Amino acid sequence: MINKAILGGTFDPIHNAHINVAYEALERFNLEEVIFIPAGNPPHKIKLKKTPAHIRYEMVKLAIEKETRFSISDFEIKSKGLSYTYRTLKHFKEKEPETNWYFITGEDCLSYLEHWKYIDEIFNICNFVIFSREGFKEKEEIIKKKKSILLKYGKEILFMDASILDISSTKIRNRIKEGKEVSFYMPDKVYKFILQNNLYK
């Protein structure tokens, strides 16, 4: 069976940590492909100001262009309404029903995971992978959440210690506003694109 993963995010901007997570997942889960999906209108970020979708899409495209096992989808940014994870996963599962799908997201999602729309269906569609920037310690809250989800949905959440730098898109945007150097946080073409388009000033 073919294994593929979906890595969704606002990618505002995409940075080296996103890329490293994708590479880590390729090896860990024997993936044929990681599909980057720039978020359209995520329900938990409705009020947050975002860079236009076509610009975020272009930055992701530039960041991954040299890796044949990475691809990009405009499914969410072209879809109308709120960008629910369930709708995205359902789309790809219907497109490739024989594929074994993984969905990769950050540790911060754990706290409200059970409140996601159609979370029970999401668990039926894919393997849920949580990654941490700092590496997973057996924190009490994580152990409780793992047990809770296993009991409620009969599904095991997969955890991935991603060897990544302490980088966030928010940190990058703030550093640019402050006139600080950010080139080492992202692929060179993304950095040049940000400069050329005067983003995040």
Curated annotation (Swiss-Prot):
Keywords: ATP-binding, NAD, Nucleotide-binding, Nucleotidyltransferase, Pyridine nucleotide biosynthesis, Transferase. It catalyses: nicotinate beta-D-ribonucleotide + ATP + H(+) = deamido-NAD(+) + diphosphate. Its EC number is 2.7.7.18. The gene is nadD. InterPro entries: Cyt_trans-like, NadD/NMNAT, Rossmann-like_a/b/a_fold. Pfam families: CTP_transf_like. Pathway: Cofactor biosynthesis; NAD(+) biosynthesis; deamido-NAD(+) from nicotinate D-ribonucleotide: step 1/1. This is Probable nicotinate-nucleotide adenylyltransferase. SUPFAM superfamilies: Nucleotidylyl transferase. Catalyzes the reversible adenylation of nicotinate mononucleotide (NaMN) to nicotinic acid adenine dinucleotide (NaAD). One of its GO terms (biological process) is NAD biosynthetic process.
